[in-house]
């Protein structure tokens, strides 16, 4: 089991779902500092309390942040290094969903400009701004093991004639990650991607707005050959990539859960 003792981490989208599971697991692995950012502060207190129960020695700092703002992302990362003196790893989990089954064929004609821009702005631009800011601060730190993990999706592998903005944003996230990985590896920074399959998070119902219940969504995906996984399973892969146990892996896009071939 990799230890994160004395290490500092930054997590976007860290207040719920996969991001929160990653924060909790980092604390269980004895991380010194977890700086999480999320567009909503609703879950900050409850997450801090749950982490304090599992590991009171882990410092958790919460920031309300919209990853669509490059300037605010830069300021957040710079403040982490200024306050805590280091940044060993980061996971960029922030993202938004797009509902399926809402558009008539040909679905491309109902993919409107506003939704396209909104989803790409968070799921792609947000990852770009965050990764760039993380590399910017990491490259000036003393030599050491540093790792960045971006979260894409099963949609990066599939070719569904719907939810164009979401699928495109996640495919682009995976491509961007691979390119950055090749660019910064020689600077001592490993960059990888995780592509979760169907995962039981608060965002799951947003992908299937016509479904009557969460169980109905799970049954539908199971019938298609896609069992529903849990956020903790994705978090274990993210934390492994953030740890020294995953050296020398870089530029990978790891599927977690069921995925099309």
UniProtKB/Swiss-Prot annotation:
InterPro entries: NAD(P)-bd_dom_sf, SDR_fam. The active site is at 166 (proton donor), 170 (lowers pka of active site tyr). Pfam families: adh_short_C2 (PF13561). GO terms for biological process: indole alkaloid biosynthetic process. NADP(+) binds at residues 18, 66, 132, 166, 170, 201. Coiled coil: none annotated. GO terms for molecular function: oxidoreductase activity. The keyword Glycoprotein applies. Glycans are attached at residue 43. Its EC number is 1.1.1.332. Keywords: Alkaloid metabolism, Glycoprotein, NADP, Oxidoreductase, Signal. It catalyses: chanoclavine-I + NAD(+) = chanoclavine-I aldehyde + NADH + H(+). Transmembrane segments: none annotated. Pathway: Alkaloid biosynthesis; ergot alkaloid biosynthesis. The keyword Lipid metabolism does not apply. Residues 1-20 form the signal peptide. Homotetramer. Chanoclavine-I dehydrogenase; part of the gene cluster that mediates the biosynthesis of fungal ergot alkaloid. DmaW catalyzes the first step of ergot alkaloid biosynthesis by condensing dimethylallyl diphosphate (DMAP) and tryptophan to form 4-dimethylallyl-L-tryptophan. The second step is catalyzed by the methyltransferase easF that methylates 4-dimethylallyl-L-tryptophan in the presence of S-adenosyl-L-methionine, resulting in the formation of 4-dimethylallyl-L-abrine. Belongs to the short-chain dehydrogenases/reductases (SDR) family. This is Chanoclavine-I dehydrogenase easD. It comes from Claviceps purpurea. The lineage of its organism: Eukaryota, Fungi, Dikarya, Ascomycota, Pezizomycotina. The gene is easD.
